[in-house]
């Protein structure tokens, strides 16, 4: 938006934006503005509000080391870069002090250069390096749509890969553009130690709470393996089985079975 306002032309190569000096200036301005606005929102503490008595501290800094993407398809991407390293130890120290760590899509090289990074890359690499339990992406769409355009409630990594294969280049069925950015990142994170990745809408009020604290959620959950699996019962399960069938036995729906009989079966 800043580039458009300034009349600066946007150039892309293979889906990557070329960040020249003018574009980098706009990126720095936008990142600084957003950071200040987020800090202001987290500083709210008015009485008789949900934030009453809150004492939240926000930490930001040069936690992300970046490197240039270089030349792609014969074009120098200039200040467009990728994550080289996340200073996970420094971030953990801040988290141990109960700070919220704010990472921007800007990284710095050991020579002091500034690079424009993709927010998906920063979020994914940070989640991996911190061994996060969850990685959450807020999107314009509700989640990952299936063939009937309903939203997949949950996908394993293998199922998510199949979705991408069936909707890739040359396929008649296409995914929403933001899903094509975030779903591969969710797959990467879940194959490198992150337990769960969530893709949810940023437009739905209460989406984050609904996704995290309800069984079905409101978006798409990506996990390394299925959340629910079937297995043969063992003797350790007898107590739980008795608890499940007792009401049915009491109502005459099932014939009563003793613990000894269940253990034998």
Labelled PLM ranges:
Residues 213-235:
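Conserved N-terminal entry element of GNAT/NAT acetyltransferase domains
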Residues 151-152, 209-217:
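Glycine-rich anion-binding loops and their surrounding alpha/beta cores
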Residues 194-199, 204-210, 221:
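Active-site or pore-adjacent capping/gating segments
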Residues 1-196, 203, 231-240, 245, ...:
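Nucleotide/pyrophosphate-binding catalytic subdomain
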């Amino acid at each position: 938006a800043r580039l458009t306002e300034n009349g600066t032309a946007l150039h892309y190569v293979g889906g990557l934006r070329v960040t020249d000096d003018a574009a980098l200036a706009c990126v720095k301005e936008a990142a600084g503005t957003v950071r200040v606005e987020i800090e202001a929102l987290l500083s709210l503490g008015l009485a008789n509000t949900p934030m009453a008595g809150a004492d939240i501290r926000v930490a930001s800094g040069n936690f992300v080391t970046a490197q240039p993407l270089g030349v792609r398809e014969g074009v120098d991407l200039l200040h467009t870069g990728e994550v080289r390293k996340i200073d996970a130890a420094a971030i953990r120290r801040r988290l141990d002090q109960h700070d919220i760590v704010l990472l921007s899509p800007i990284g710095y090289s050991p020579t002091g250069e500034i690079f424009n990074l993709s927010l998906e890359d920063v979020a994914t690499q940070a989640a991996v390096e911190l061994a996060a339990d969850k990685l959450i992406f807020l999107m314009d769409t509700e989640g990952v749509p299936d063939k009937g355009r309903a939203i997949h409630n949950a996908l394993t990594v293998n199922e998510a890969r199949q979705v991408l294969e069936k909707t890739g280049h040359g396929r008649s069925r296409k995914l929403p553009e933001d899903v094509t950015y975030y779903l591969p990142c969710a797959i990467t994170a879940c194959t490198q130690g992150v337990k769960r990745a969530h893709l949810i809408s940023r437009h739905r009020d209460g989406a984050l709470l609904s996704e995290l604290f309800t069984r079905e959620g409101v978006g798409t959950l990506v996990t390394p393996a299925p959340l629910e699996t079937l297995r043969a019962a063992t003797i350790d399960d007898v107590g739980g089985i008795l608890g499940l069938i007792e009401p049915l036995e009491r109502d005459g729906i099932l014939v009563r079975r003793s613990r000894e009989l269940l253990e034998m079966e």
